[in-house]
Structure formats: structure tokens, C-alpha cells
């Protein structure tokens, strides 16, 4: 088997790999590969190296605020050069290497390094990166990033995409290059959602989403979830102003309601404001950063997961985020926005309720509806868990990863892949 070297520009709470990165690494280790993650510790506080159940994390220790795109852009080349030098050192000892680079911010380094040492490159595209930064940067810059990504795809031996819209977007770029549209349409995303599991096997492009390992959400804990007096709404994730997730607005909405509690976990620029709201209102609780290992139990022990997203951001509108699959796996309903692709799934499968973005009075009405109809919530939660067990679980993704790596081993030269 191979030495798989992953590269990622960030870590999560505790200086460890994000869940989807860790799950991918676990699956690769299970297949017999040795895994090293070269990651940027943007706090500069954690150990240089540490051992995990799936391999080793090597950290590039350089402080860089998560919400400072200009500083990030200035410091990114240093991380990419550091990663390349580490890989070159490993290559002196080990020739059977596969590079696995996460997201567009690392991909230029991946293409450069893979060409130098002539090894396969897997591009793990978690999101429409140009779509994500659009708004924070000019349209010209976002479009340039899109075309740059399309150019680099030809140098990748294998590609992993997350949600259906991103899969369709990348497929368009593989077919049309720089002439491909900036984002996939909703119709294209729906067509990907209709694809069967076998369609994602034995090809250069596969789909591995933010789905969860169901053994982290055991059935016995779901059946014996905590009983509470208050209706508990949960959000654990990114706490940034842009693109908005409606966290402040939800907190202010809930603050005026009786017998409702809004628990918020995570880190970001909204934290100072959330701490002020926490201090002012008894039923809004900022829990601080939550370790990924604790997310399943927190989710199981809530009544509903909130995942509101501003649909004016194209990445938001067409995404299939972590929160959706955490709620599914935990067997709890989800509240989201009806304009989102995720909202359409929630409505169609009847696993939660939706409201129009910005209509916080409608959010209040939905919360009231759920509070006083526990039977409805219970049925939504059961449907949600069944959907996770049937389709949206890590076991299927693991098979796709195995298939992609077999493809990559057979096709080490991207030009013939």
C-alpha cells in the first residue's frame, strides 16, 4: 500500500483534523495505507507532531486569523512551500506516495509538488471555493479563481467532491475547462442527487459528502436521549458574519420566547457579540468551541438542529453542510431555509421545517409549531435517521474512496486519466 500525504490549511478545535478529513484518513488507514496530514495550525499553539488512530499530524505553526483573507493570502505561500519540502523529504525515503490535497487553497501546491516527484494527486474539493469567497473578494477575483481551478483539474489523477452541486460543477469543468459555468444549476444538482451509488465508482471523479459514521450516533443513545423542560435548539459550527448563518438573528428571536433554549457552539468573529447576548438573555447559551468527539452527543440531546444560510451566496444556496447530516445521524429534525437546495431536501423527505431567509417571524412560528407538536418532531427525527441508515452514511463513502484510490493507482498519469 501507499504512503498518503494529505495537506490542509486548517485544523479544528483541539488542533485536530476536521471530521470529514479524519474520516477519510481513517478509511484510507483501514485499507492499509499509511497516512500523514500536513496541516496549518493557525493558532500556533499545538504540538508540532501528534499521533492519531489513523496516522500522524504534522503542524505548520504560524498564527493567522481565520477571518483575515488578506493575511491568509500573504501567508499561504509559506505553508505551501513548507508542505512541499516535507513531501520532498518523505520522497527520499518512500517512492510509493499518493498526494491528497484538500480544497483550492492548497491545490496549486499539490499540482507543483506532484509534477516534481511524479506521483499521483488526489484533489479533495469540499466546497465551491470561488463561490464561498465571492462577496469577500471582487467578482473578477472570484471568476479568476474559478478559471484557475478549472485549469488545475487536468493535473489531478483523482477528484473527490462533496455535495451534489459541487460534483456537477466539477464535472462541468472537466468537460468544458475554463468555459464551464461558475456554479452548477439547481437542475444539475438534482440530477446528481438521482445518481445511484455505482455511478460514483471506478472513475476520476467521485462524491464523498459530509455524511457521518453512524457508530458515532448509536441507536441506544438516541432512544435514551435526555429529557428536558425546555425546547433545545442547537447550532455548532462556524461563527462568522459572512456568509451569514443567521445566528445573531436567531438568538435575538429566541431571547423573546419562553421555554426555548438556543445553545451555540463554535468559534469565529461573532463570539464577542454572542457572549454579550448570552450575558443578557437566560435562554441563549454560548458553549464555546466544541470538540468534534462531543458533537454527536450534543446533537442527540437536542430537539432540533438549526442550519440557516443566506441564499444570496451561491455556495450556501447549493451546499449540503455538516449540520444536515449530523441531524440525520442523530435522529433529530432540522430547521433550515426554503430557498436552499438543502431546504428542498428537508421538505421533500419531511425531516424538518423551513422558513424564508430573513423572515425571523416565520422562524419563531416554526419553533412554536415544533414545541407544541412533539409527535411531529419525533416522526421527523425517525425519518431522518432512516434516511441516514439507507443512503447518507459513511459506509458508502468509504467504498467510493477505496474505488477512487484503485483508479488512481491504475492511472498515475493525469493526462491519461
Task: List the predicted regions and their residue ranges.
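Nucleotide-activated donor-binding/catalytic signature segment of Leloir-type glycosyltransferases, i.e.
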Residues: 230, 258-260, 272-297, 301-304
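N-terminal strand-loop element at the rim of the active site
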Residues: 7-12, 27-78, 166-171, 179, ...
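Conserved donor-binding/catalytic core segment of Leloir-type glycosyltransferases
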Residues: 4, 210-212, 216, 225-245, ...
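A short, glycine/small-residue-rich beta-strand->loop->alpha-helix junction that serves as a flexible
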Residues: 6-23, 44-46, 240-245
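Short hydrophobic beta-strand element within catalytic cores of glycosyltransferases
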Residues: 304-307, 326-336
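Membrane-proximal helix-turn-helix segments that form the acceptor-binding/catalytic region
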Residues: 23-26, 84-91, 108, 112-116, ...
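A short, well-ordered alpha-helix in the C-terminal region of glycosyltransferases
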Residues: 362-365, 369, 376-391, 400-403
Amino acid at each position: 500500500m501507499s504512503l498518503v500525504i494529505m495537506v490542509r490549511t486548517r485544523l479544528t478545535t483541539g488542533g485536530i483534523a476536521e471530521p470529514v478529513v479524519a474520516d477519510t484518513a481513517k478509511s484510507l488507514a483501514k485499507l492499509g495505507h499509511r497516512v500523514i496530514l500536513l496541516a496549518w495550525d493557525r493558532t500556533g499553539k499545538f504540538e508540532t507532531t501528534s499521533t492519531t488512530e489513523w496516522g500522524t499530524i504534522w503542524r505548520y505553526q504560524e498564527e493567522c486569523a481565520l477571518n483575515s483573507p488578506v493575511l491568509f493570502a500573504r501567508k499561504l505561500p509559506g505553508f505551501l512551500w513548507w508542505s512541499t519540502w516535507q513531501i520532498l523529504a518523505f520522497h527520499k525515503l518512500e517512492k510509493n506516495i499518493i498526494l491528497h490535497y484538500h480544497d483550492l487553497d492548497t491545490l496549486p501546491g499539490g499540482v507543483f509538488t506532484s509534477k516534481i516527484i511524479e506521483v499521483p494527486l488526489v484533489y479533495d474539493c469540499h466546497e465551491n471555493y470561488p463561490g464561498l469567497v465571492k462577496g469577500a473578494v471582487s467578482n473578477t477575483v472570484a471568476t479568476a479563481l474559478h478559471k484557475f481551478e478549472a485549469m488545475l483539474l487536468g493535473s489531478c489523477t483523482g477528484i473527490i467532491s462533496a455535495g451534489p452541486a459541487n460534483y456537477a460543477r466539477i464535472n462541468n469543468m472537466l468537460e468544458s475547462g475554463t468555459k464551464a459555468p461558475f456554479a452548477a444549476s439547481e437542475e444539475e444538482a438534482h440530477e446528481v442527487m438521482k445518481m445511484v451509488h455505482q455511478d460514483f465508482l471506478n472513475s476520476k471523479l467521485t462524491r464523498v459528502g459530509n455524511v457521518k459514521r453512524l457508530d458515532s450516533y448509536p441507536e441506544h443513545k438516541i432512544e435514551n436521549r435526555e429529557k428536558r423542560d425546555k425546547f433545545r435548539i442547537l447550532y455548532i459550527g462556524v461563527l462568522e458574519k459572512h456568509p451569514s448563518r443567521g445566528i445573531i438573528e436567531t438568538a435575538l428571536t429566541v431571547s423573546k420566547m419562553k421555554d426555548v433554549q438556543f445553545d451555540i457552539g463554535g468559534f469565529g468573529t461573532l463570539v464577542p457579540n454572542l457572549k454579550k447576548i448570552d450575558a443578557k438573555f437566560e435562554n441563549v447559551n454560548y458553549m464555546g468551541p466544541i470538540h468534534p468527539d462531543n458533537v454527536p452527543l450534543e446533537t442527540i440531546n437536542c430537539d432540533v438542529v438549526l442550519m440557516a444560510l443566506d441564499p444570496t451566496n451561491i455556495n450556501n444556496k447549493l451546499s449540503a453542510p455538516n449540520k444536515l447530516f449530523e441531524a440525520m445521524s442523530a435522529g433529530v429534525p432540522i430547521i433550515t431555509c426554503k430557498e436552499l437546495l438543502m431546504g428542498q431536501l428537508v421538505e421533500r423527505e419531511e425531516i424538518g421545517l423551513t422558513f424564508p431567509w430573513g423572515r425571523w417571524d416565520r422562524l419563531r412560528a416554526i419553533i412554536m409549531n415544533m414545541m407544541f407538536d412533539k409527535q411531529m418532531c419525533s416522526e421527523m427525527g425517525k425519518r431522518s435517521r432512516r434516511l441516514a441508515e439507507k443512503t447518507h452514511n459513511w459506509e458508502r463513502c468509504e467504498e467510493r474512496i477505496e474505488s477512487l484510490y484503485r483508479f488512481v493507482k491504475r492511472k498515475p498519469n493525469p493526462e491519461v486519466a
